[in-house]
Amino acid sequence: NWKKFWKPFKVDDKIIIKPTWEKLPEDTTEDTLVVELDPGTAFGTGMHHTTRLCITQMKKYLKEGQKLFDVGCGSGILSIIGLMLGAGEAMATDVDPNAVSAAIENARVNHINMNQYDVKAGDIITDVDFRHACGVEKYDLVLANILADVIIPLSGVIKDNMKPGALFVSSGIINTKEDDVREALLANG
């Protein structure tokens, strides 16, 4: 059972991710952002270094009240933390309906206001109607902690959802795909 090996851990000096079935470490301070999580079958426990990279970049660039788009949300960890850090609203999408269910449940556990959080199942790369239903020129920050083979085609369409001047943060790219991803991102602006 994988749950017995997953314990609370610090993402950085201010964020702790805690499995819903575990207790907080005794040294947790009042100013710590505690994120409770049960990924179920969805990807995203927060332990992977690519998730930590996205969280670090989100903390660096997200401004209070901004709109956040989490593409390939898995457990919802990135968008949930974004809302806890002050995003005004967040959209999270995944092609896996189980991930969407996990993200909604994790939002509930973390007392996220569902008027600020929308989670949908669908493919924004191939389904133009779905992509536009997620919001055209709406988001200040887009996060995609997914495989390079998804980021490459995503780079050609995600601008539809981004405000002018918005930032796109991606992670999950293996070294052998780094140049391909860079080329796609540069080619697609």
Report the location of each language-model feature.
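N-terminal auxiliary segments of SAM/dcSAM-dependent transferases
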Residues: 1-28
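Surface-exposed loop/turn positions
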Residues: 13-15, 66, 166
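Hydrophobic residues in well-ordered beta-strands that form the structural core
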Residues: 18-19, 92, 170
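A short, charged helix-loop
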Residues: 29-39
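Conserved SAM/SAH cofactor-binding pocket of Class I
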Residues: 41, 45-123
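S-adenosylmethionine
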Residues: 95-189
